Design a protein with these regions (language model features):
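Short, glycine-rich nucleotide/cofactor-binding loops
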Residues: 12-13
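Envelope-exposed proteins and targeting segments
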Residues: 2, 9, 32-34, 74, ...
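Short amphipathic alpha-helices and their capping/turn segments at secondary-structure boundaries
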Residues: 22-29
Length: 118
C-alpha cells in the first residue's frame, strides 16, 4: 500500500489517505492476532512540543479510522514522535517536507516491547 501523508499543520485524514487506510484495514483484518504500532510524524517546522502533540493526534486519527473500518482496538497502539525522524530541514520547500508528515505502520512481534509501549 502507499504511504499516508498529512497536509501541513493538519490532522485530518485526506480522501487519498482514507483510501490507503481502507487497504491497510483489509490487510490487518486477515490476521487479528497481529499487533500494529501506528507512529505519527511531522516535518521540522514548529516547536518540538507542538510537533509531538501534532504527531500524536495524527497517529490517533489513523488508529480511530482503522477502528471505524472494523480493526479491533486491541491490535493497535498510537505513538507520536514529532520531527524526531524528519529528513528535510524546516527551510526546505513544502513539497519536500511533505514526505516527513507521515504515518509509519509497524508490525510488532515482541510482546514485551508491545506491553512497554504506552
Amino acid at each position: 500500500f502507499n504511504n499516508i501523508y498529512f497536509e501541513f499543520d493538519k490532522t485530518e485524514i485526506t480522501p487519498k489517505a482514507a483510501t490507503i487506510i481502507d487497504e491497510i484495514a483489509q490487510i490487518m483484518l486477515t490476521d487479528t492476532s497481529k499487533k500494529y504500532l501506528i507512529t505519527g510524524c511531522t516535518d521540522a517546522k514548529g516547536s518540538s512540543q507542538y510537533n509531538m502533540e501534532l504527531s500524536q493526534k495524527r497517529a490517533d486519527a489513523v488508529v480511530n479510522a482503522l477502528i471505524k473500518k472494523g480493526v479491533p482496538n486491541k491490535m493497535l497502539k498510537a505513538k507520536g514522535v514529532g520531527a524526531k525522524i524528519s529528513y528535510a530541514s524546516q527551510n526546505a520547500p513544502n513539497e519536500i517536507r511533505e514526505g516527513d508528515r507521515k504515518i509509519i505502520v509497524q508490525i510488532v512481534t515482541n510482546m514485551d516491547y508491545w506491553n512497554y509501549i504506552p
